[in-house]
Amino acid sequence: MTRLTHIDDQGRARMVDVSDKAETVREAIAVGFVRMTPETLALAITGAGRKGDVRAVAEIAGVMAAKKTADLIPLCHPLALSKVEVSVEVAEGGLAVMARVKLKGQTGVEMEALTAVSVACLTIYDMLKAAEKGMVIETVRLVEKTGGKSGAWRAE
């Protein structure tokens, strides 16, 4: 059975001690999607929404969120990230969000990538909610990670 690393032998939550782990280059990619009507998508594409350029603001929000992950997720380590790249692209039925996060360190950046995507999606919703309250944030997930003891992993 797999042991949960954030739970000690007494069942209490704890931050994992990474001091003995090797420093390696670690990277994670996460994705998400905000489904919306064609009319709302047109507002996002043209930047004609009431709050400005939806895609640009969401990308910046995602970068900021990745840097704040340790403040939002209780047992995450504060990390000196070397790269955070967030993109918001037009796709059929909505906006596709992707975050790529990288560092050289002792712990992975999966949570930073997932946090970046989640906050970018929430920002898209916030900026367009005046036009459509029924937007759906979906499929937020990790699609790839490299580095560290467990090595590379890719979603199927």
Curated annotation (Swiss-Prot):
Annotated catalytic residues: 126
Record key words, sorted: Lyase, Molybdenum cofactor biosynthesis
InterPro entries: MoaC, MoaC_bact/euk, MoaC_sf, MoCo_biosynth_MoaA/MoaC, Mopterin_CF_biosynth-C_dom
Keyword Lyase in annotation: yes
Transcription regulation among keywords: no
Top enzyme category: lyase
Superkingdom of the source species: Bacteria
Record field: catalytic activity: (8S)-3',8-cyclo-7,8-dihydroguanosine 5'-triphosphate = cyclic pyranopterin phosphate + diphosphate
Family to which this protein belongs: Belongs to the MoaC family.
Quaternary structure annotation from Swiss-Prot or TrEMBL: Homohexamer; trimer of dimers.
Protein name: Cyclic pyranopterin monophosphate synthase
